[in-house]
Amino acid sequence: MSEPQNGRGALFTGGLAAILASACCLGPLVLIALGFSGAWIGNLTVLEPYRPIFIGAALVALFFAWRRIYRPAQACKPGDVCAIPQVRATYKLIFWVVAALVLVALGFPYVMPFFY
């Protein structure tokens, strides 16, 4: 038996990809702000070449999550998770938080020079 598709996996994938996309730039800044230093912080930029892949994966996952979350409630069977208004509202909130993370990942390299 397969579990019903409710968009949770796509939201998780989008959030994870957004975090990975900004890890190369945001990680060193956070560590420096917390007082950590050292030459090993430069090794965190090893993810930089993969940043476009992570951003692309995040955008694709967000597209599928958007399709699943913003479909009409009539498309859900009665008793399904997507038919409950509180769950739909929570998923929409999480979706927009993850979308904001992706926007931060997209814009962070352009804003980062102002912090260093």
UniProtKB/Swiss-Prot annotation:
Q: Membrane-crossing residues?
A: 16-36, 46-66, 94-114
- Select a single GO molecular function from the record's annotations and give it: mercury ion transmembrane transporter activity
- Give the subcellular location: Cell inner membrane
Pfam family for this entry, one: MerT
- Cell inner membrane: present as a keyword of the record? yes
- Main subcellular localisation: membrane
Protein's membrane topology? Multi-pass membrane protein
> InterPro entries, from UniProt?
Transprt_MerT
Which keywords accompany this UniProt record? Cell inner membrane, Cell membrane, Membrane, Mercuric resistance, Mercury, Metal-binding, Plasmid, Transmembrane, Transmembrane helix, Transport, Transposable element
Q: Name one GO cellular component term.
A: plasma membrane
Where does this protein hold Hg(2+)?
C24, C25, C76, C82
Q: What does this protein do?
A: Involved in mercury resistance. Probably transfers a mercuric ion from the periplasmic Hg(2+)-binding protein MerP to the cytoplasmic mercuric reductase MerA.
| Membership in a protein family | Belongs to the MerT family.
Q: What is this protein called?
A: Mercuric transport protein MerT
Provide the species name: Serratia marcescens
Name of the encoding gene: merT
